[in-house]
């Protein structure tokens, strides 16, 4: 399940990767805090969430030249938070009980590598992975103050479909057909 784009690829995260993954996410948390954003400022994500992702085989790492530079959870079993959408509708009719979509959560890139287009590369690789797993679309959500993701997602062909509600509030919901 590994794809490569020159010397960059993705693979399932392993237990041995947990500290590196957590350092990447801590860097993202700090970037968001310094930018005055609310997202990821209330103890989520945390090392326990990363461990659960790895144990459930949904943690994915992006690797460049044998170095982990990105992380996300790629979920293909549905997300109940996506069963209800406000101010719009999904492009597909799939829901968490008959899931035919993938979901990207907790995506982060090593903060020292910001501005190199790695988030877009990572998403492209995840889109291809989702295709290979038989998904008909990919869904992702982000906070209203995550300016980078709100810019990147439409640029990459994602359609804003509406608002979903997660534990800590509403999120802009996007979907791309595969």
Placement of each model-derived feature along the sequence:
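Conserved acetyl-CoA-binding loop-helix of GNAT-fold acetyltransferases
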Residues: 109, 115-128, 151-155
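Conserved GNAT-fold acetyl-CoA-binding loop/helix
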Residues: 29-49
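Conserved beta-hairpin
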Residues: 58-72
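Conserved acyl-donor/pantetheine-binding loop and adjacent beta-alpha core of acyl/acetyltransferases
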Residues: 73-106
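Conserved GNAT acetyl-CoA-binding A-motif
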Residues: 130-142
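Conserved beta-strand-loop-alpha-helix junction that forms the acyl-donor binding cleft
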Residues: 114, 140-150
């Amino acid at each position: 399940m590994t794809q490569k784009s020159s010397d960059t690829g993705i693979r399932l995260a392993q237990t041995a990767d947990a500290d590196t993954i957590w350092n990447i996410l801590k860097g993202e948390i700090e970037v968001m805090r310094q930018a005055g954003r609310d997202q990821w400022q209330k103890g989520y994500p945390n090392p326990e969430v990363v461990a659960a992702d790895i144990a459930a085989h949904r943690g994915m790492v992006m690797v460049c030249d044998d170095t982990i530079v990105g992380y996300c959870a790629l979920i293909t079993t549905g997300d109940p938070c996506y069963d209800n959408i406000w101010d719009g509708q999904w492009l597909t009719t799939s829901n968490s009980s008959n899931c035919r979509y993938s979901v990207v959560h907790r995506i982060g890139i090593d903060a020292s590598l910001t501005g190199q287009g790695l988030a877009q590369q990572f998403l492209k690789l995840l889109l291809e992975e989702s295709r290979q797993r038989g998904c008909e679309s990919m869904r992702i959500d982000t906070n209203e103050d995550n300016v980078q993701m709100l810019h990147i997602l439409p640029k990459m062909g994602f359609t804003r479909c509406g608002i979903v509600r997660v534990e800590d509030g509403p999120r802009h919901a996007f979907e791309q057909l595969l």
